[in-house]
Amino acid sequence: MASSAASSVRPPRPKKEPQALIIPKNAAEEQKLKLERLMKNPDKAVPIPEKMSEWAPRPPPEFVRDVMGSSAGAGSGEFHVYRHLRRREYQRQDYMDAMAEKQKLEAEFQKRLERNKIAAEEQTAKRRKKRQKLKEKKLLAKKMKLEQKKQSEASSETQEQPSSGSEEASGTEDEEEDAPSFITGR
């Protein structure tokens, strides 16, 4: 008997250290406490709640044996049965109407979203086209400026070639003009 008592004795559980009671004052503190609790034991699985399923009424019965009316005799229990069936049917119809309205609103929302997306894409395309046009205009202006510069250089070279003697004299002037001048107004 002593051996059975010894085998049923379990080793003592490790004692948990006492924790101070912390009452969160706002949502951020509450979230912080939850995170700390989760991070104490990262191996433990985190409970993720399932999405609550939307309430739906019971489907209508496939076969109704006795179709009773509201004109059941006084004192009979049939009127209560009729009343409950009628209530369920009205509930089901209201639910179907609400779902149809919800689907209609969702479809309208999706259409509006699509229209907004198309309008935004059109606006973006318009602005992109404008940017490209400006870029091309700047590039064309730059090319024209380079061509004019080349033409002016070519024309100045053609003017300088016939007067080769004056070129030496004008060369010193060019050097003076190219030299940096720190005097304003020169």
Swiss-Prot record:
Organism lineage string: Eukaryota, Metazoa, Chordata, Craniata, Vertebrata
Start-end of Basic residues biased regions: 126-143
Family note: Belongs to the PRKRIP1 family.
InterPro entries per record: Prkrip1
UniProt xrefs under PANTHER family: PRKR-INTERACTING PROTEIN 1
Protein name (record): PRKR-interacting protein 1
Coiled-coil parts of chain: 86-153
Subunit structure, as described in the record: Component of the pre-catalytic and post-catalytic spliceosome complexes. Interacts with EIF2AK2.
GO molecular function, one term: protein kinase binding
Location of region: Interaction with EIF2AK2: 1-50
Residue segments, region Required for RNA-binding: 51-143
Job of this protein: Required for pre-mRNA splicing as component of the spliceosome. Binds double-stranded RNA. Inhibits EIF2AK2 kinase activity.
Pfam families: DUF1168 (PF06658)
One CC-aspect GO term: spliceosomal complex
BP terms from Gene Ontology: mRNA processing; RNA splicing
Cell compartments where the protein resides: Nucleus; Nucleus, Nucleolus
Keyword Transmembrane carried by entry: no
Region (Disordered): 39-61, 119-186
Stretches with biased composition (Acidic residues): 170-179
Region annotation (Required for nuclear localization) ranges: 126-138
Keywords from the named record: Coiled coil, mRNA processing, mRNA splicing, Nucleus, Spliceosome
Compositional bias of kind Polar residues: 153-162
